[in-house]
Amino acid sequence: QFLSFSDSRGEAAFFASYMTAAYSEFLRRRGIWHVVEKNKENMAAHPWEIQHFVDELTSYFDSCRTFAEPGDKGVENLTATSRKNAWIAVLNEMVNARRSTSLASLGILKFNYKGNAEEIMSGVAEAYQQKVEDVKALFDLLAMEIVYHGALEGDCDLTDDEREYIFYTPKPKRVKRCKDMDKDKKKSYLAGWSAAIRKNGSLLKNGRLKRVMSVLNLDEASANELLQMYWDEVLRGEESLSTAGNDEFYFSTERFT
C-alpha cells in the first residue's frame, strides 16, 4: 500500500530497498540461529572455526534455497549465493556483536580470539596480581574491539555495497600499533591500538587505555606499555593480525572460533 500511494517515487524506492535488506538480514540471522540450535552441544564442547561455521551455514541456506529468486524452479545452483550470504551473516554478527540485539548479546553466539591462550593470560594475571578469568575477559574484549572497529576480513570478496552494509563504509577498516597524530590525522578508517603521543610527550588516552588502567589498577604509562607489549607478543604473535601494508593491519576470521 505504501508503494502504491506514496507521494514520492524516491521514498517508495528507498522503502522497498530497505525492506529487502531487512528481510535478507532476518533470513541470515534465522539461519545462524538454526545452525547453532542444531549443533550447540558440539559447538560448546569443540568450538568451531569460523570457516567451518560458514560452511555449515552455507549448507543450510543451500538446502532451504533461502536466497532463491522469485519464481525459482529448484534447478539453479545457489551455492555461491548461499556462501556469500553466509559470510555476510557471520561478518555482520562479529562486527556488531556488542549491539543489544546481536545474537552474541542474546547469548546465542560467542566469538573468541585464539591468541588469548590460557598460558599467556595466566602469565599476565600473575604479573599483575589479578584473577585469570578477569584478565582473560579484559583481553578478549580488547581483541574484539578491533573487530568492532571493522578491521576484519573473511574468505570472500565483498562489493562496496556489501562493505557499506557490514562496516558502514566501503573502505576497508584497519588498525595500527600507534597512530601518528600528524600523518594519520585524516585517516578515519584507521584505529590506533595504544595511546597516541602528543607533541609534548603526553598520552592521548583511548578507550582501551582507560579500560586497562581501570581493570588492572595501573597508571597510564604502565597501561600503555602493557598494550604495546600485548600488540608485539600476542597480536603480532602466533595468532597474528594480517598486514595490509604501511604498518596497517586487520584480523582474518581464521583467528577466531
Map each language-model feature to its residues.
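Charged, low-complexity interaction segments
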Residues: 1-257
